[in-house]
């Protein structure tokens, strides 16, 4: 297992953009910034992945849907990205104190930080191995949920765990299979809706998939989300099933 500390942050301009994206007012910026600073006090963003020699080919992961035979011949790397346990503890503290606005702001800010973490992790892989990340395949999206088991088994770490419903702890964690390429023009910046590369075939496919949706950025109060966001917010069938079982 290889572990890399990720160096991520949000500038004030990026925070202002996020503030607008999540439908806050300019007057909310001071509180939004204070929550961001609180998160960054103890956040420990890290990326974990199998060694290059242990990298799986796509066909070794159980595939469905959009994973084609041609893509199955490309090299890939199992990856876990996490912000650590502090954001979970902070949100719990906010909730216990009835600070629901701060808790919701923390959720929004952590989404932005995870998008940054994807980008930084992709860059670290390129620096270390000379391979660029072409596409990210997520269990429960492009891969079946059961692919989570092989990703975790290949990496062999204990900081992030999953339960029988494949819900991750710490919650601000994501597991995926990074498909690699040597071609610079095929490199993926991150989740499609945050990427400026409008010519990217991955983005065009994503836009076609969601072309009937009005907004690219999610309303996390209940709207169905594109899969990259579902993984961050854990909105998958397994998590829903777990909640239903607890309520019965």
Model-derived features with residue positions:
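Active-site helix-to-loop segments that bind/position phosphate- or nucleotide-bearing substrates
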Residues: 1-98, 102, 214-241, 247-248
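Charged/polar, solvent-exposed surface patches and flexible loops
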Residues: 17, 34-41, 108, 123, ...
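Conserved active-site and cofactor/substrate-binding residues in soluble primary-metabolism enzymes
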Residues: 30, 34, 112, 116, ...
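Intrinsically disordered or highly flexible coil/loop and linker segments, enriched in small
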Residues: 41, 45-52, 119, 131, ...
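Generic recognition of cysteine residues
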Residues: 58, 108-110, 188
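Conserved mixed alpha/beta catalytic, RNA-binding, or beta-rich assembly cores of soluble enzyme
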Residues: 72-138
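Short terminal or interdomain "cap/linker" segment that borders an active site or interface and mediates
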Residues: 132-204, 216-248
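Composition- and surface-driven signal marking solvent-exposed, interaction-prone regions
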Residues: 206-213
């Amino acid at each position: 297992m290889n572990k890399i500390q990720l160096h991520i942050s949000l500038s004030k301009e990026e925070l202002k953009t996020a503030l607008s994206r999540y439908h806050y007012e300019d007057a909310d910026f001071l509180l939004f910034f204070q929550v961001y600073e609180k998160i960054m006090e103890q956040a420990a963003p890290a990326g974990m992945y199998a060694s290059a020699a242990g990298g799986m080919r796509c066909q070794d992961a159980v595939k469905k849907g959009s994973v084609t035979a041609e893509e199955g011949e490309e090299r890939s790397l199992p990856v876990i990205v996490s912000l650590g346990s502090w954001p979970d503890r902070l949100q719990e503290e906010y909730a216990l104190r009835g600070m629901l606005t701060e808790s919701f702001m923390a959720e929004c800010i952590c989404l932005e930080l995870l998008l940054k973490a994807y980008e930084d992790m992709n860059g670290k892989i390129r620096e270390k191995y000379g391979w660029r990340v072409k596409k990210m395949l997520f269990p429960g999206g492009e891969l079946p949920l059961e692919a989570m088991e092989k990703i975790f088994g290949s990496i062999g770490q204990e900081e992030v765990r999953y339960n029988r419903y494949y819900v991750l702890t710490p919650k601000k964690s994501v597991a995926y299979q990074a498909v690699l390429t040597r071609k610079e023009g095929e490199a993926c910046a991150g989740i499609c809706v945050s990427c400026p590369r409008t010519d990217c075939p991955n983005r065009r496919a994503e836009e076609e998939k969601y072309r009937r949706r009005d907004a690219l950025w999610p309303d996390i109060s209940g709207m169905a989300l594109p899969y990259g966001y579902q993984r961050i917010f854990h909105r998958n069938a397994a998590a829903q099933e777990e909640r239903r079982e607890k309520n019965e």
